């Protein structure tokens, strides 16, 4: 099938399929991908936790490194993806290929820079991310293979997002799920079978992500996509690079500040010992799993919102946002209820240490309550990013981990002690919800007015 035929087929799918069927069709593969990714993160936490409390703390330190990798990948992936989707919505396939090529080759180059700088300064880098002296050997051993694979990991995130924004979430899922399952299988083999310890966890992650990269790249090389990767198509215009960076700024704010927030959380927790760092790390990994459902549904919304906004079908954008909020909320209620009932056993599964549980359990309960606000936060952020409202999207993306969390993590532990460490994230979530809701409601009303104006223009 030619690129033009693929584009026509995809246009009909994205602009005519009923919204619930379309969103769920795109969201289910994305949710599965994110759940598998979260499961292999939890698997790392579980297997590393069998070594020692200090090793378990290293998972939290390397999580901040992973957040940096994700920030770079999502910035380029979301930044180009929203433009690609809107370009396909307006039937401009040449622009789609240009932005896809630019983001992919830029990701490879950025990954090489991160790998070189990170490996050259590894011990200092890990201390900067919040490591203690006892955690440091584990953190360095874990991080080294991941840094080596950073160029492929960042590029994989770009390809994953381009596939999703083209409406091909199933293809994106194949690459991510394969990598995730492989990671889970390889963890115990490298860590215990080969006796490599925390270094084995890093090698398993790096190897599985490299295989995921190869699978995702094959989708583009085999002509499964409308946009393609060509060196000659990489833009020479600073304005178009700027468009990618502006479009990806919300993702950079979200993921970059998550890295900074994770670093500050580790620093605040390490005042209370390795058990506190390990406990907060376990809670963060569990909630990464839970929140991946809301984010997965939200990522199902993104190509629908971007494509239909580009096609000037504003009512479908509004319907998609409202449906996504309802679906995400229902899924979170079920998950949170199950986790609350089994919270103690869930935490002990990852590290059966009374000191770790004493820190993790209250933090877990606080976050269970606040996470039910996430559907509004996620939909507001992703809707604005998808339709090209980068300013609003960036501001809202920076609220959760930046505008609110960073001041709270600097202030509350000084005034409330360990309770301040445990309550920072849920309090930041409440404030972010309060800010996001009026932004979203105003835009939904604006979409209704834009749809009425579009109908009047078509009728005249």
Give the role of each language-model region:
Residues 1-27, 84-151, 193-249, 305-370, ...:
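Short alpha-helical transmembrane segments in multi-pass integral membrane proteins
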């Amino acid at each position: 099938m030619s690129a033009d035929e693929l584009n026509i087929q995809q246009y009909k799918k994205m602009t005519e399929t009923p919204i619930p069927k379309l969103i769920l069709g795109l969201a289910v593969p994305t949710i599965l991908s994110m759940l598998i990714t979260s499961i292999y993160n939890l698997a790392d936490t579980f297997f590393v936790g069998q070594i020692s409390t200090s090793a378990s703390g290293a998972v939290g330190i390397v999580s901040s490194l992973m957040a940096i990798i994700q920030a770079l990948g999502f910035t380029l992936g979301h930044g180009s993806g929203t433009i690609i989707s809107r370009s396909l919505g307006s039937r401009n396939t040449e622009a789609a290929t240009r932005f896809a090529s630019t983001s992919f080759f830029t990701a490879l180059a950025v990954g090489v820079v991160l790998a070189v700088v990170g490996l050259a300064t590894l011990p200092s880098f890990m201390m900067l991310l919040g490591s203690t002296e006892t955690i440091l050997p584990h953190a360095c051993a874990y991080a080294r293979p991941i840094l080596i694979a950073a160029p492929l990991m960042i590029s994989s995130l770009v390809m994953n997002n381009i596939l999703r924004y083209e409406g091909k979430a199933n293809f994106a899922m194949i690459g991510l799920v394969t990598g995730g399952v492989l990671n889970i299988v390889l963890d115990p083999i490298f860590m215990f079978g080969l006796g490599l310890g925390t270094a084995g966890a890093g090698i398993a992650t790096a190897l599985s992500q490299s295989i995921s990269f190869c699978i995702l790249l094959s989708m583009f090389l085999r002509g499964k996509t409308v946009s393609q990767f060509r060196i000659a198509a990489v833009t020479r215009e600073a304005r178009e690079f700027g468009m990618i960076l502006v479009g990806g700024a919300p993702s950079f704010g979200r993921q970059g500040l998550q890295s900074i927030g994770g670093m500050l959380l580790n620093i605040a927790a390490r005042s209370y010992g390795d058990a506190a760092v390990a406990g907060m790390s376990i809670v963060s990994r569990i909630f990464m799993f839970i929140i991946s459902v809301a984010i997965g549904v939200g990522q199902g919304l993104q190509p629908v919102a971007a494509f239909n906004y580009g096609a000037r079908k504003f009512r479908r954008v509004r319907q998609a946002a409202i449906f996504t909020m309802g679906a995400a909320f229902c899924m979170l209620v079920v998950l949170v209820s199950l986790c609350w009932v089994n919270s103690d056993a869930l935490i002990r599964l990852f590290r059966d240490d009374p000191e770790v549980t004493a820190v993790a359990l209250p933090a877990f309960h606080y976050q269970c309550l606040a996470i039910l606000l996430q559907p509004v936060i996620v939909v507001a952020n992703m809707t604005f990013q998808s339709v090209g409202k980068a300013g609003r999207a960036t501001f809202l993306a920076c609220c959760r981990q930046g505008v609110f969390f960073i001041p709270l993590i600097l202030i509350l532990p000084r005034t409330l002690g360990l309770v301040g460490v445990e309550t920072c994230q849920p309090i930041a979530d409440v404030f972010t919800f309060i800010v996001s809701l009026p932004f979203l409601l105003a835009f939904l009303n604006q979409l209704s007015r834009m749809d009425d104006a579009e109908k009047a223009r078509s009728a005249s």
